[in-house]
Amino acid sequence: MGFTLLIDNYDSFTWNIYADLASVGGNPFVVRNDKITLKEIEGMFADGELERIVISPGPGHPRTDSGVSRDVIAWGMGKLPILGVCMGLECIVDLLGGEIAYAGEIKHGKTSLVQHDSIGVFHNLPQFLSSTRYHSLSAQIQSLPSVLQVTSTTKESGVIMGVRHRTFTVEAVQYHPESCMSEGGRGLMANFIQMKGGKWGGENAWCGVPAEGEGEQPKAKTNGAPSLPTILNKIHAQRLLDVEQAEKIPATTPANVSTSLSLYTSPPLINFRGRMVSTPHTAVMAEIKRASPSKGDIAPTASAPQQALKYALAGASVISVLTEPTWFKGSLLDMLAVRNAVDSLPNRPAILRKDFVLSKYMIDEARLYGADTVLLIVAMLEPQQLKELYDYSVSLGMEPLVEVNNPTELSLALEIGSKVIGVNNRNLHDFNVDMSTTSRVNAALNGRDVVLCALSGISSHEDVEKYVKEGVKGVLVGEALMRASDTKAFLRSLIGLPPLEVVPKPRPLVKICGIRSTNDAKLAINAGADLLGVILVPGTKRCISTSTAREISALVQSARSQSSSKPLEPSLSSPWFTSQSALLSSRRKPLLVGVFQNQSLSDILSAVDEIGLDLVQLHGDEPQAWAKFIPVPVVKVFRVSPEGIVRGGEIRRPGLNQAILLDAGGASGGGGEGKAFPWEHAKRLIQSGEVGSEGHVPLPVILAGGLTPENVGQAIEQAGEGVWCVDVSSGVEGEGGKVKEKVEAFVKAVRG
């Protein structure tokens, strides 16, 4: 009677395997992986005693901790049946060129339901076996050798639980069928010991595995077992469950989501296609990606809004936010935070919901949480469903990104009228990457008016350059950008842009405040002041009437009409205050600023209209949010105490007031008292930088408080390059108002 050689990789479960083999007539003979040689095993086989081999579980990695196991497998394939368990599977996959890596989950003594193909060692076993797992490594489907096929996976997460050689009688399972908590273990062993010889077919035809050349296994077995799902199918099933659960939560029922949309609680849209085509260079769709089925964890603790700001400030045209939670570790809250983070940028990136969208409800979710577009994957949708979802998305103002992987899918995308098509170089059924996919699909477009994008696997300028030559307008980059140490430099190099030049900062603008007459205004204008401030606060010593303010406004407008300055487009990748200060600096001058303090919004709006103000300065405790309702740019004052405490609101908050004015915290709180605050506090605030810039972009401020012709140069030097304007009032005054010599001296001291 022949025997089963059981190679023990120093694991206690080897005893259980021994017991199962013995109970089904396998006649096991156990030897540890370093206590036998391949020559001895060859002798056993030559003597006709050795009929089959089992490679046991074991700790460690197959290359370093499996002893003779790999050599035994290499020798035995094609000669006799081989079964690998856990470490045994890893040995087989690794030996044949596959990748053994982190499984995406750690399981030690936990059970999972395993679905299988119902043939080979799984012949006549029921589906969804409860199976015990002790491992953190597994075979990676994207690198699985072509000679192997997947035979089983976990139902809930799609991790490979079994593989089979396509030609030889070699089977392996990742889980532990020998455990007392596993179902069907002895049935699996009984199937294995019935196998004969080294190849499928012939006397092994009973188990259903076709011999080489007889074709692939059928899609479904006669016992009703489902065909083995691809990764895409697993994700599809999981997302259906996720959506079903979300729809049952009271706050996110379809009716409540629809009501929220009807109340316009969602952020306003921008045109996705328009944002792509308006980009003067190759449009980069920068992806926020914490993990993936193929790579496992990439940046699991990454902050989505922080990463989004990095991308936006680096020049990304689109920010792709993965919202799938199980495999990609994303969420809808990530997308909403991203949308809010980039909202204040002058030409913000479009926001893409990158997910496996299967229903109108998911499109409603996307719109509610700030998306400008959604991804529709042709491979996941029936043609009619694809058309319905495309039309519905367009009806909400969102032109979808339609993803294809081959010319057949491209035809479906074109048939429904897609305007932006992304070609995924990664086949979502097996997650293999083929960088030529985009080129093949592009050739099938035949010059149609479609914005074509290349998706996935792009990590170098050479990748991008190749596609651009073929007419590709945009590229999606995820992992490479997430891992880049310098996001802006990497993004620019990716699309072939030179490094940004350091442009010297211009000298600050000059604001002469407290203008009380047309004579004061003429002095300031003739001296070269950029901004003139009029006080419109009743009860203060410099307050002027509306009629006087109108006269000053007319004088300012007349002087401005002779200016040759032209508005400039702000940098598309500049933060809020930097872009706003650039816009104000580029306008024809002088500009008239109306100063208000703790007055009603209606009074402010009336004054803007009656006087013709160019800017409004909120000098009291007004809410910053008022800036949204005032039709001209708003300067908000923040008061700095001698100790450096700042009062007045959220000084670095973007998207509301266009400018920040730093003044001393005087007793009256009104300013204009000739008091300065320590300028090192201004430097500290400036160096804190714009939000999202990590201190690399100085916070632009207007410096005020106790400035004079004698000290303004020192103040600018001490505060640093973030001072884009200086504001003076009492420092250039005499008994009767502004003093010509002082005004001229102040402007000269600033300009140098």
Swiss-Prot record:
Active site, UniProt feature: C86, H176, E178
Catalytic activity: N-(5-phospho-beta-D-ribosyl)anthranilate = 1-(2-carboxyphenylamino)-1-deoxy-D-ribulose 5-phosphate; 1-(2-carboxyphenylamino)-1-deoxy-D-ribulose 5-phosphate + H(+) = (1S,2R)-1-C-(indol-3-yl)glycerol 3-phosphate + CO2 + H2O; chorismate + L-glutamine = anthranilate + pyruvate + L-glutamate + H(+)
Record EC number: 4.1.3.27, 4.1.1.48, 5.3.1.24
Binding, L-glutamine: G58, P59, G60, S136, L137
Region (N-(5'-phosphoribosyl)anthranilate isomerase): 509-752
InterPro entries named among the record's database cross-references: Aldolase_TIM, Anthranilate_synth_II, Class_I_gatase-like, GATASE, Indole-3-glycerol_P_synth, Indole-3-glycerol_P_synth_dom, Indole-3-GlycerolPSynthase_CS, PRAI_dom
Region of interest (Indole-3-glycerol phosphate synthase), ranges: 231-495
Keyword annotations of the record: Amino-acid biosynthesis, Aromatic amino acid biosynthesis, Decarboxylase, Glutamine amidotransferase, Isomerase, Lyase, Multifunctional enzyme, Tryptophan biosynthesis
PROSITE patterns: GATASE_TYPE_1, IGPS
Glutamine amidotransferase type-1 domain location: 3-202
MF GO annotations: anthranilate synthase activity; indole-3-glycerol-phosphate synthase activity; phosphoribosylanthranilate isomerase activity
Keyword Membrane attributed: no
Domain of life: Eukaryota
The keyword Amino-acid biosynthesis belongs to this UniProt entry's keyword annotation: yes
Pathway in which this enzyme or protein is active: Amino-acid biosynthesis; L-tryptophan biosynthesis; L-tryptophan from chorismate: step 1/5; Amino-acid biosynthesis; L-tryptophan biosynthesis; L-tryptophan from chorismate: step 3/5; Amino-acid biosynthesis; L-tryptophan biosynthesis; L-tryptophan from chorismate: step 4/5
SUPFAM superfamilies registered for this protein in UniProt: Class I glutamine amidotransferase-like, Ribulose-phoshate binding barrel
One GO process term, biological-process aspect: L-tryptophan biosynthetic process
Function statement: Trifunctional enzyme bearing the Gln amidotransferase (GATase) domain of anthranilate synthase, indole-glycerolphosphate synthase, and phosphoribosylanthranilate isomerase activities.
Protein name, as recorded: Multifunctional tryptophan biosynthesis protein
Species annotation: Cryptococcus neoformans var. grubii serotype A (strain H99 / ATCC 208821 / CBS 10515 / FGSC 9487) (Filobasidiella neoformans var. grubii)
Protein's gene: TRP1
